[in-house]
Amino acid sequence: GSIVKALFKLALPIMGTSFVQMAYNLTDMIWVGRIGSDAVAAVGTAGFFTWLGVAFILIPKIGAEVGVAQSVGRKDMDEAKVYIKHSIQMILCLALFYASILIIFRKPLIGFFNLGDIDIINNAITYLVIISCGLVFYFINPVFTAIFNGYGESRTPFLINSIGLITNMILDPILILGIGPFPRMEVAGAALATIIAQAVVTIVFLITAAGKTELFSKLNILSAPDMEHTKRIVKLGFPVALQSGLFTGFAMVIARIIAQWGPIPIAVQKIGSQIEAISWLTASGFQTAMAAFVGQNFGAREWSREFQHL
């Protein structure tokens, strides 16, 4: 069929999924902004650590995407399942490790920014701890998304992630401002709304996966991983993860510098970064689609189709 048409069909839902992720953060900022710039600064500061967590997510995410795409191209579904199993095992271990670090070292981590205002510091710590408790959902959803994208079914994760966004949009005003019987939780409410929405996404992914026997049957997640596939996943994902981690690290240093002028500059930086994300999320959507498309054709040894679409 038409390569351009196939690429756009794959890319548009992936781009949509990227924008859904951005909309999560924007929704939080809109409702938290009603409390004041101090609350936005607290959420923005703690949010750097979830952003840094993306570097960990990218290792099994890229590994799953490429490994599944190439296996599907070769029509080797058993090999695809091996990549799926290893990527899920890896993301669960990384989530537990990173969440433990964030909870144990929460005070020095937030202290890095030299915020100066005790209320902002306490709110940032509260947000960080609540998010850390649900970090496994935040980590595993992009890997499920990558598995479906690698399989060539990008519409499914877009729809599932959209359910999470709608859940978050409903819960944010209820939990942040306190509507009806719910207490006003402010910053804690924003964190709770986010992890509940992410948990809903994980549950829907698991239900969907149960019906996708060609991808998820007999995975045996508790079996020991083999080093060959683990190394390949790390080799595929580490360069992108390192780039993401360095980018976030620089942003954190900038935030530390501007924090000396108070909470408003931090809030402005956080909101500005969300708007800036529109440009690179568009490119990221096409990049992910190309990775899946090239991976499937590489696996199928359809070299001519690779060069045509590049």
Where are these regions (language model features)?
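Short alpha-helical transmembrane segments in multi-pass integral membrane proteins
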Residues: G1-A11, V68-V136, F182-F238, V294-L310
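Signature of the first transmembrane helix
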Residues: K5-E65, A69, F238-I258
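Residue-level recognition of pore/gate-forming positions within transmembrane alpha-helices
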Residues: I14, S18, M22, F48-W51, ...
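Helix-terminus/linker motif at the lipid-water interface of multi-pass membrane proteins
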Residues: F19, A23-A41, I110-I118, I174-M185, ...
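Small-residue-rich hydrophobic transmembrane alpha-helices
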Residues: V40-S100, Y138-P157, F250, A255, ...
